[in-house]
C-alpha cells in the first residue's frame, strides 16, 4: 500500500469508522496507472499531487466519494481516463464530482479581470451545484500554492499567485475555509 494512501486512510478512519479501503485503494491505483510517468515541476511523480489533495480533503473530514474525487480530479483533464470509466468503477456521484472539478478547472481567470473577480467567484459558486466540488478545487489550489516554488516560469508563477489571491482566497474565506 502506498505511504500517502496510508496517511489518507488514517486521517479518514479518525472520523469515519466505515471506510471503504478497497475503493480508495482502487482510486490510488487508477491515479498511478493513468498519470503514469507524468511528473510535477518538482520532479516527483504527478500522482503525488492528487494524493496530497485527497489528504487535505480527509483533513476537512469529507466523505469517501470526496476523497476518491480528489484522487481522480486531474484524470479527465490530463489522461485518457473517461468519465464513463470513472462512473463504472466508482459510481455516478464520483463521476459527477470529477466532472464538476474538471469544469471549474477549465474556467480561466485573466489578470485584466481583477475588478470582475467578485463576479467570477459568484460564477464558480453557481457552477458548483455540490459544495464538495468547490472544496476539492480549493484543496487542489492549496496544494498547488504549497508547491509553487518549483515552477520556473516567473510569469506563470505570478499568474497562479494572482488568481489565488484575487479569486480562490476570498472564495475559501467566504465558505469558511481559512486555511
Label for each model-derived stretch:
Residues 1-179:
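Active-site helical microenvironments for divalent-metal-assisted chemistry
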Amino acid at each position: 500500500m502506498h505511504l500517502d494512501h496510508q496517511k489518507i486512510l488514517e486521517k479518514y478512519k479518525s472520523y469515519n469508522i466505515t471506510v471503504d479501503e478497497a475503493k480508495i485503494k482502487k482510486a490510488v491505483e487508477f491515479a498511478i496507472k493513468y498519470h503514469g510517468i507524468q511528473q510535477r515541476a518538482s520532479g516527483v511523480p504527478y500522482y503525488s499531487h492528487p494524493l496530497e489533495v485527497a489528504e487535505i480533503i480527509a483533513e476537512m473530514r469529507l466523505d469517501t466519494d470526496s476523497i476518491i474525487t480528489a484522487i481522480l480530479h486531474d484524470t479527465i483533464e490530463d489522461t485518457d481516463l473517461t468519465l464513463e470509466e470513472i462512473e463504472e468503477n466508482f459510481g455516478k456521484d464520483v463521476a459527477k464530482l470529477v466532472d464538476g472539478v474538471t469544469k471549474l478547472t477549465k474556467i480561466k481567470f485573466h489578470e485584466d479581470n481583477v475588478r470582475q473577480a467578485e463576479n467570477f467567484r459568484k460564477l464558480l459558486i453557481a457552477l458548483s451545484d455540490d459544495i464538495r466540488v468547490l472544496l476539492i478545487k480549493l484543496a487542489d489550489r492549496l496544494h498547488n500554492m504549497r508547491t509553487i516554488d518549483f515552477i520556473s516560469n516567473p510569469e506563470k508563477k505570478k499568474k497562479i499567485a494572482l488568481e489565488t489571491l484575487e479569486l480562490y482566497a476570498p472564495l475559501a474565506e467566504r465558505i469558511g475555509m481559512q486555511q
